[in-house]
Amino acid sequence: MNARDKRYDESLDAALLDPVEAAAYLEAVIEMDDPAALLLALRQVAKAHGMAEVARRADLGEKTLFKALSENGNPTIATVHKVLHAVGLRLSVTPA
């Protein structure tokens, strides 16, 4: 990873620690209607908070969390709910 990419990752991680920023980020990705992009965004939010800490707060094993949020992951709604709760967010539904 080059220095520019590292700075971007660090900047994104810092922004995603703010629940308002993280929620806006996830909402923007949801609007893309791309499940793979949503999985990546959820992984980025969890990474910003520290995967080990998110796993602990979500009462999930670290390997389970990494697998669920991996590129080929397919997390259950229960796992998504736990991860969101662990980072200070919640799932909600609004009219389309």
Which role fits each region the language model picked out?
Residues 1-44:
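N-terminal flexible/basic segments that precede or flank functional cores
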Residues 43, 52, 81:
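Short glycine-/small-residue-rich flexible loop motifs, especially phosphate/cofactor-binding loops
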Residues 47-67:
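Short alpha-helical DNA-recognition segment
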Residues 55-56, 94-96:
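Short, flexible active-site-proximal loops enriched in glycine and acidic residues
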Residues 70-71:
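Residue-level detection of the helix-turn-helix DNA-binding "recognition helix"
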Residues 76-94:
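DNA major-groove recognition helix of helix-turn-helix/homeodomain DNA-binding modules
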